[in-house]
């Protein structure tokens, strides 16, 4: 009776973390008490793996370090308990068979039980292999010691798995938060046309985050339970090894087999390369286009216009602006061939070049065409890089003749100039372009090594107007501006504008 009471008292003053009698007990405001060293170590572990969260290891109620109080009453009980020992009579009863009252001296290998000599002769143990406890105690001590070492190793693996799953959980949270931030930033600049797509994509990300973190949280809980199970087994083995021979041998084979057959449950994880891609309709293409412009703008060069001897073109003093003095120019409708009655009509083409030649690398610039109802711009190749350019005699807007340009006529008709047929080598074919929002500013990007020329509608969030591919850059190319018959100037924008 007394031993049962003592066991109940001992349980009340046992640390839930180390499972030993409390040492320098500290109590939380939730009522649970822990060893000072144990709760301090738990606090440090929480700071490492739970981003500063402090909660009771038993009930998980949060606490503040300043609210922890020493529990002197419990400390006194522990001190008294350490002085109390079982009476000789109670100790003697523990060593005797509960059924026969005889001394427990034998060990039954088949049943893994400590028995008396009458038990050995009973039907229950007849034919079993029995040994004196002294004969097998050392053997099983070694086996349990080996099992303990194996279990400790598995505990380390379990703790590492627990730490890894927490780290992965935090990594996923950071990664998805980072993705959400980027998505929000991109949508902020495309707000007028992407409000619905942003909301939909963020909902998908939230669902993805919820599903992944829910699964990882479940795995984390399983890993915590697994680790706790390991601690309990280790505590049991340590108790056996430190206790009597009877404690050592009672059920020893079963626990050894259980430990030997134990396998650690691995958490379900998610590989980042298995993540879904943007699924919003057309959103990926829109964002890629926007990012293409963002990347192109990294190569913005400060383009100025070269002097020329064309009487119809007027270049401003800052060499950034060109306008037409003579409005006469020949321009056919989209979808038709560009023709001239005679070569003298070339004299009415008022195109001018940028002063910078492009022979390698990536180059980007922007042209302000606001309020103009006609213009041609892009790049051209093949002219001498001297101080004066005279290109009046050679304007034939075809890529095979060194022109990669787009144009506007009548205020709303946007076109790209492509190579004409072999029957009309001097007549480019004009293909209409679909432009939803008329650009006030056009970005031009040349990738010399990739042999591409791209045109962006800056007014419409950088949407791609047209892209020339497989350009034959056999000569240096130059920025090209032609204000055409419209007297409103074209202006080269500075990188800081």
From Swiss-Prot:
It catalyses: S-ubiquitinyl-[E2 ubiquitin-conjugating enzyme]-L-cysteine + [acceptor protein]-L-lysine = [E2 ubiquitin-conjugating enzyme]-L-cysteine + N(6)-ubiquitinyl-[acceptor protein]-L-lysine. A zinc finger (RING-type) spans 15-60. This is Tripartite motif-containing protein 5. The B box-type zinc finger domain and the coiled-coil domain contribute to the higher and low order multimerization respectively which is essential for restriction activity. The coiled coil domain is important for higher order multimerization by promoting the initial dimerization. The lineage of its organism: Eukaryota, Metazoa, Chordata, Craniata, Vertebrata. Gene3D superfamilies: 2.60.120.920, Classic Zinc Finger (3.30.160.60), Zinc/RING finger domain, C3HC4 (zinc finger) (3.30.40.10). Belongs to the TRIM/RBCC family. The modification Phosphoserine is found at residue 87. Residues 137-225 form a coiled coil. Can form homodimers and homotrimers. In addition to lower-order dimerization, also exhibits a higher-order multimerization and both low- and high-order multimerizations are essential for its restriction activity. Interacts with BTBD1 and BTBD2. Interacts with PSMC4, PSMC5, PSMD7 and HSPA8/HSC70. Interacts (via B30.2/SPRY domain) with HSPA1A/B. Interacts with PSMC2, MAP3K7/TAK1, TAB2 and TAB3. Interacts with SQSTM1. Interacts with TRIM6 and TRIM34. Interacts with ULK1 (phosphorylated form), GABARAP, GABARAPL1, GABARAPL2, MAP1LC3A, MAP1LC3C and BECN1. A zinc finger (B box-type) spans 92-133. Keywords: Acetylation, Antiviral defense, Autophagy, Coiled coil, Cytoplasm, Immunity, Innate immunity, Metal-binding, Nucleus, Phosphoprotein, Transferase, Ubl conjugation, Ubl conjugation pathway, Zinc, Zinc-finger. SMART domains: BBOX (SM00336), RING (SM00184), SPRY (SM00449). Pfam families: SPRY (PF00622), zf-B_box (PF00643), zf-RING_UBOX (PF13445). The gene is TRIM5.
């Amino acid at each position: 009776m007394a031993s049962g009471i003592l066991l109940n008292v001992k349980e009340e003053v046992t640390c839930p973390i180390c499972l030993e009698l409390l040492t320098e007990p500290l109590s939380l405001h939730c009522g649970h008490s822990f060893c000072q060293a144990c709760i301090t170590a738990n606090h440090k572990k929480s700071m490492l793996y739970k981003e500063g969260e402090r909660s009771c290891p038993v009930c998980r109620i949060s606490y503040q370090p300043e609210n922890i109080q020493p529990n002197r009453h419990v400390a006194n009980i522990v001190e008294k308990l350490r002085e109390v020992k079982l009476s000789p009579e109670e100790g003697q009863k523990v060593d005797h068979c509960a059924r026969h009252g005889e001394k427990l001296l034998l060990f039954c290998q088949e049943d893994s039980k400590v028995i008396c000599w009458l038990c050995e002769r009973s039907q229950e143990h007849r034919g079993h292999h029995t040994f004196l406890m002294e004969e097998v105690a050392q053997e099983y001590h070694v086996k349990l010691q080996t099992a303990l070492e194996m279990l400790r190793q598995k505990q380390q693996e379990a703790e590492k798995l627990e730490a890894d799953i927490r780290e992965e959980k935090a990594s996923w949270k950071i990664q998805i938060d980072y993705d959400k931030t980027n998505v929000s930033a991109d949508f902020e600049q495309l707000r007028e046309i992407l409000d619905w797509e942003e909301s939909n994509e963020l909902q998908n990300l939230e669902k993805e985050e919820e599903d992944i973190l829910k699964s990882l949280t479940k795995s984390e809980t399983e890993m915590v339970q697994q680790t706790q199970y390991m601690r309990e087994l280790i505590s049991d083995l340590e108790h056996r090894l430190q206790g009597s021979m009877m404690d050592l041998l009672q059920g020893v084979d079963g626990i050894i087999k259980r430990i030997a057959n134990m396998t650690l449950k691995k958490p379900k994880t998610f590989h980042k390369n298995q993540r879904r891609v943007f699924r919003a309709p057309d959103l990926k293409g829109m964002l890629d286009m926007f990012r293409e412009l963002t990347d192109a703008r990294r190569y913005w060069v400060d383009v100025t216009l070269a002097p020329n001897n064309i009487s119809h073109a007027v270049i401003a003093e800052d060499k950034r602006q060109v306008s037409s003095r003579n409005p006469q120019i020949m321009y056919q409708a989209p979808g038709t061939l560009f023709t001239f009655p005679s070569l003298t009509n070339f004299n009415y083409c008022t195109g001018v070049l940028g002063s910078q030649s492009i022979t390698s690398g990536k180059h980007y610039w922007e042209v302000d065409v606001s309020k103009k109802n006609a213009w041609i711009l892009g790049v051209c190749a093949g002219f001498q890089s001297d101080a004066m350019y005279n290109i009046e005699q050679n304007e034939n807007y075809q890529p095979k003749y060194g022109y990669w340009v787009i144009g506007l006529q009548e205020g709303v008709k946007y076109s790209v100039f492509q190579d004409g047929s072999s029957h009309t080598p001097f007549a480019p074919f004009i293909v209409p372009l679909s432009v939803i929002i008329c650009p006030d500013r056009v970005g031009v990007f040349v990738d010399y090594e990739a042999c591409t020329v791209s045109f962006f509608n800056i007014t419409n969030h950088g949407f791609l107007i047209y892209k020339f591919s497989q350009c034959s850059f056999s000569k240096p190319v130059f920025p090209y501006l032609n204000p055409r018959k419209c007297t409103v100037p074209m202006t080269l924008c500075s990188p800081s504008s």
